[in-house]
Structures are given as structure tokens and as C-alpha cells.
């Protein structure tokens, strides 16, 4: 009930201003008696994934809490993990405003944020300050002004700084809003990046005495051949996991709606079937060797189960969480326990 009231107010506001207000409110009320307005307690359903035991299979996708300011608040809602970021080595403002658009009739969102964040050092401070014990994945990327050919260096910088404080690290090479970024999904650039990250992981595991798994986040806008090549590279480089998928450049399911022609990545309900199809193809190619987090368009518990049936072991929500509220977390966990 509280969320529906808050949502009604927020949906009257500019989307990005509403987002900032939500983050500020959550940050201010976490670990106080006021968190009773959104905290949820329900029977958990532990999942073993990439060698880590998660309390349940439902995570918050990257992009909601870019700077890790609300880890404790989101943990109180019942998320099994929170993926913060995307974070870059240096702070950057992102793309020009406006850059976030609701398509309410389709339960969808278009964004062209452009990795706006306060930088990796700020994120590390927030990771250290979190009190809840939440399992946090850190989604890392490259700065906009770093040439694609040198992008690997940005990922290695971020990885080294967040490693000690992460449950896992997600490598984002699939956002459509950073020029040239998606080219890292192909050929020698991909192999070089994955190989370098695995070598760095080995060094950091020895340094810190802990093994932090790394997962690759891919786009939905890939051909079957491209998915096969990515899967082959993941297996050859012994990556720990995959996250499928990021937002799409497609406008299927939203054509004609207000804001549908805005540039950027589309998320929400219209992405669901495309994302699930990519998960199925990727799972078939990986042959059970590498586990998958399924994300993209989950709006109901049934949507989440479809992704698990397609080959994912865990799921993440973002747009569906905005439209449905925290109850979606509990709904998915209960459906997972009952299957």
C-alpha cells in the first residue's frame, strides 16, 4: 500500500528527479525505525551461484544504486543480492538531460544515462560503510573518454579497487549508451579483456586470500553466431558467470507510444521475451559450464520462472521493481520455493 502511494507521487515527477528522491529517502531511512515502510521478511530460498551462497535468487540489477548509497535499504526489502554500479575509475556526469523516460502503458523505461557515477573511490567508501551484510555485486565499466582500445585498463583499475568488498564483479560491455562499448563483445577485444581480467583475478585472490567470481553482462541485440562466440570465449577464459541481458535498442512493443523514439536502451516488459530467448541460446552454448543471471523485462513471478526454465540460475529486476514495487521480490521467491 505504501509503495503504491509513493509510486503515484513519484510518477508525477520527472523520472530522474524521482529517482534521486527515492535514493535520498532510502539512504536517510535505512537502519532506522522508518525502514518499516518498505522492509520485508519472508522465508528465504538459498541458491549456490558462482561458489557463493545467496539467501534467495532475486537480485537488484545494476543502475538503480549506481554509487552504492542504499545497500542497506535495498537489503531490507529482501533482495538476495544488490548489484551496484555501473562504476568507472573516474567520476563522470553521464549524458545530457533529459536521459530517462517512462513508457507507462508498456511498463517500460528508456534510458541513455551514460554511466553517470561518482567514481570508484566513492563507491568503495560506500561499500565499506554498509552495515547490513548484504551480498553486493559491483558492475564495472569504462570512462566515456577512455578509448575502446584502452578500455581494458579501466576495468582492471575498477576490479582492483572493489575486489576486496565484492561478492562478485560484473563486467559491463553491453550498455548501448557509451560510444563503442559494445564492440568489446566481439573477437580479439573480448578475448583480451576476459583473459586480462582472469589474470588480475588470480593476482587479487592471492593478495586478499579470497576468490571473488567475475561475470560478463551481455546485450540482447546479438545474433546466434555472436552468442556462440561469446559463450566460447567465456568457456575458454574460464569465466565464472554470465548476466543476460542489458537493455535493447529494439523498439518492438512500444512503437507509437510517447517517448518511444527517444535514443537509448529500452528496459521493462517489452524486453522480456527477447531477454529470455538470449538466455536460452546462451545456456545451450554454455552447456552448463557457466551459470547465468537472467535479467530483462521481469514483471511477474511467472516471468522470472520463465528465465530460470530457459537456463538462468538467478534473476535480477529493475524496471519491474519500479512498476510493481518490493512485493515483486517476495512473489518471485515464493514462486521459486514452490516450483
From Swiss-Prot:
Keywords on record: Cell membrane, Flavoprotein, FMN, Membrane, Oxidoreductase, Pyrimidine biosynthesis
Organism for this UniProt entry: Shewanella sediminis (strain HAW-EB3)
Pathway: Pyrimidine metabolism; UMP biosynthesis via de novo pathway; orotate from (S)-dihydroorotate (quinone route): step 1/1
Topology with respect to the bilayer: Peripheral membrane protein
One Gene Ontology term, aspect cellular component: cytoplasm
Protein's UniProt keywords contain Membrane: yes
Family note: Belongs to the dihydroorotate dehydrogenase family. Type 2 subfamily.
Compartment(s) where it occurs, according to its Swiss-Prot or TrEMBL record: Cell membrane
Record lineage: Bacteria, Pseudomonadati, Pseudomonadota, Gammaproteobacteria, Alteromonadales
Amino-acid positions noted as binding FMN in the UniProt annotation, renumbered to this chain: 62-66, 86, 139, 172, 217, 245, 268, 297, 318-319
The protein's name: Dihydroorotate dehydrogenase (quinone)
One Gene Ontology molecular-function label: dihydroorotate dehydrogenase (quinone) activity
PANTHER family in the record: DIHYDROOROTATE DEHYDROGENASE (QUINONE), MITOCHONDRIAL (PTHR48109:SF4), DIHYDROOROTATE DEHYDROGENASE (QUINONE), MITOCHONDRIAL-RELATED (PTHR48109)
NCBIfam families named among the record's database cross-references: PRK05286.1-1 (NF003644), PRK05286.1-2 (NF003645), PRK05286.1-4 (NF003646), PRK05286.2-5 (NF003652), pyrD_sub2 (TIGR01036)
